[in-house]
Amino acid sequence: MKALFLIFHGFDKANGISKKIHYQVKALKECGLDVRLCYYDISPSGERRWMADNAVIAELGQGVFAKIRKRLGLNCIANYVLRENIHFVYIRSYHNANPFTINMVKRMKKKGAKVVMEIPTFPYDQEYITWPMKFKRLTDRCFRHRLASFLNGIVTFSNAKNIFGERTIRISNGIDFDAIPMKKQMNDTTHELHLIGVAEVHYWHGFDRLIRGLAEYYCTNPDYKVYFHIVGPLSGEREKQEILPVIRDNKLESY
């Protein structure tokens, strides 16, 4: 069966989400599907385009108008699904429900394709805390129930049985053990424990909660030492404000 795995952004080799998507595509292929990966790409010369694997399916141009076409011109993806006779479409939600994504899904369904959408984090409204962020999600909040009504299912890592009024397909989050083999060496943790977090750090990783836990732990003046090593940049101002002051105020720099 031909399948399309659709995302609405590009890739970064060091990004955990990018790696996870490639793991998912590999897993679907190992289940016997003929999978094409559709994604948004910006060439070295600044040309914006929609890609299916290594093939360009739509040139969007450069500049502001190209960004607008990226959000509004989704017919090229539906056309690709129809032209290639793809029977199964797996969409990774970008919190971008709108009339254009709805029309794209309707066209795919009209030709007999089964369409499911993965919502990696649910609920997700609480992730948008500033007014500009909330405003950007306003369109999604207006149209997401309508979009969901045209789907064959919503894939979730949560325990929710229904999302936006539609049934869910509940799966577990995972990794590719071929790409990340299990560690076999056992370290001595008799006297101290070293934790490591390797990421482009975003607030959803929860590093701030771990650090606050360390602050409470060291208030008890413990003999057993616990260290947390963060490898990777703090991605934004929110992450800096939630992590750095806690370290400074509780004198955790050594830990």
Locate each region found by the language model.
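Conserved donor-binding/catalytic core segment of Leloir-type glycosyltransferases
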Residues: 4, 186-205, 211-214, 229
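Acceptor-binding helix/loop patch of EC 2.4 sugar-transfer enzymes
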Residues: 8, 12, 115-144, 176-178, ...
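Short N-terminal targeting/anchoring amphipathic segment
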Residues: 78-99, 113-116
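Nucleotide-sugar donor-binding and catalytic loop/hinge architecture
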Residues: 1, 178-194, 218-223
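Nucleotide-activated donor-binding/catalytic signature segment of Leloir-type glycosyltransferases, i.e.
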Residues: 232, 240-255
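Membrane-proximal helix-turn-helix segments that form the acceptor-binding/catalytic region
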Residues: 26, 75, 99, 103-111, ...
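N-terminal subdomain of nucleotide-sugar transferases
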Residues: 1-44, 53, 84, 149, ...
